[in-house]
Amino acid sequence: MEVIIGRDTAELAHVGADAFESLLNRKPDAVLGLATGSSPLSIYDELAARCQAGRVSFAKARGFTLDEYVGLPADHPENYRNVINTVFASRVDFAPGAVAGPDGLATDIPAACAAYEEAIRAAGGIDLQILGIGTDGHIGFNEPGSSLASRTRIKTLTRQTRVDNARFFGDDVDAVPAHCLTQGLGTIMAARHVVLVATGRSKAEAVHQLVEGAVSAMWPASILQHHPHATVLLDDAAAHRLQLADYYRETYRSKPDWQGI
């Protein structure tokens, strides 16, 4: 696991966008795993600017979203297909229909989850998955207690996650759906490269457990300690509980250019 502690959000956005740009320049038809939430927004902004400048193209790429609320109407602004289209996909040159998501309106939920797993496999697997992290250590909607080997499935959201997400629903916790479909931890671990971004002091405990804690289902993100190519992007506030923060900073400062991200 590589831990990068940036000076500010702008630096983290550049580093995260570099990972996408490098991949797409090597493999224009790459398969991308796309997360919603506030954490990746600065990276999406940077990628949109680079696409408009002609530095990177998504024309041959495909995308798979990480999760979706169950029962949220297709035209609801917080339906994650709409969210990812608004914050990212519509701002770059993805081909029509190139970004897919779990079907939160399916009548047969297990079949929809199996179909989503098969779609990812048929596309060749995810080359780069971007992630945020919840204050309780969840990634995707894999809440504490999730199986570390889980695949795409339905989950019940914790009260804390619904409280955290209420800001997207007019601060009304009861308006946040109680259930979701999410890629499982096993699905996420199958991605070839995982980039997780976390900013702010509220994420510091989750980041500490992710990077330096024991691998445990109680902190789902900690499974990334076992990933062969995981990159964690942090600002100072999110990193302030890390015991080896100075070492991570020094390692990144002295990293040779040829190593890439």
Regions found by a protein language model. Give the residues of each.
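N-terminal glycine-/serine-/threonine-rich phosphate-binding loop
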Residues: 1-32
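Ligand-binding beta-strand-loop-alpha-helix segment within the catalytic cores
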Residues: 56-129, 246, 251-260
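A short secondary-structure junction signal
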Residues: 111-113, 140-146, 150-152, 206-210, ...
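ATP/nucleoside-binding phosphotransfer catalytic cores, i.e., glycine-rich phosphate-binding loops
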Residues: 186, 190-261
